[in-house]
Amino acid sequence: MPALLLAALLAAAPSPQFETLEPVPAAAQGEAIPACTADRRWCALIEADESDEQLMLRLYDGAPDGRAPVTSYPIESEVSEGFWKPGAVLRRAGSDEIIVGADMELQSMYSGGGGMSSHRTLIRFVPGAAPQEILTVPLSGSLMIRACFGEEDMKQRAGACHDEYEFAAELKAEGDAFPPRLTYASTAATFPGRVSRSEDSLAKPPLKPKDLVKAVDAECSVRRVFTFDPAANAYVPDAPLPDCGDYTVP
């Protein structure tokens, strides 16, 4: 093939991008809900196996409609840990190789507060090979921790009776390679001002109105680039991700 023609074909091939998997109504109440690409070329669902102890990610070539999955992958998580759902896919142009993003949502409620978070796990599906888990990153977190237990506490806190933690991240694909390069950008902030779950907020000096602002956490507001390492069969970041459990562990 002439070099110019090959270059033109490569330029015409779309760069891989995350496609959101849209839920498709289940046939019966209580059934696992599949989620599909807009063209219904690929569908996935997450359900417990026959023992009801192991979660399985099922991948379908088209809508399930009673057909057998192309392949299945056991998700390493107890059913009770969180709620899993198919989130997105990356497709390789001209190939049946795809990467599925499975999203796990965690929720916790406690006296006077609560929180939720989500993580995305990427699983690579290559025809003729066993599926491989290649990356897990936190995507979101939102927590409220009770900080007032009486009228005096309300005065000390200037009416801000909860410590709040907010975390949001975005994962994007870049370039023409497959698996593609991924960029990960996160933003984290607390309110009122800089607070920490490892400290007693009531042990600090009384708050003033000027203290009732959000404070960006620079340590957990980061940008990372992940490249796929064939030897490790996994994505590797250009620098380690920080421990942001204050935001991502409800």
Where are these regions (language model features)?
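Sec-dependent N-terminal signal peptides
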Residues: 2-11
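Acidic, small-residue rich beta-repeat scaffolds with periodic aromatic anchors
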Residues: 13-29, 35, 113-118, 125-250
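Beta-propeller blade termini
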Residues: 30-36, 82-94, 170-174
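Entry beta-strands of beta-propeller and related beta-repeat scaffolds
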Residues: 40-43, 95-100, 176-184
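Hydrophobic beta-strand positions in blades of beta-propellers and related beta-sheet-rich domains
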Residues: 55-61, 120-122, 223-225
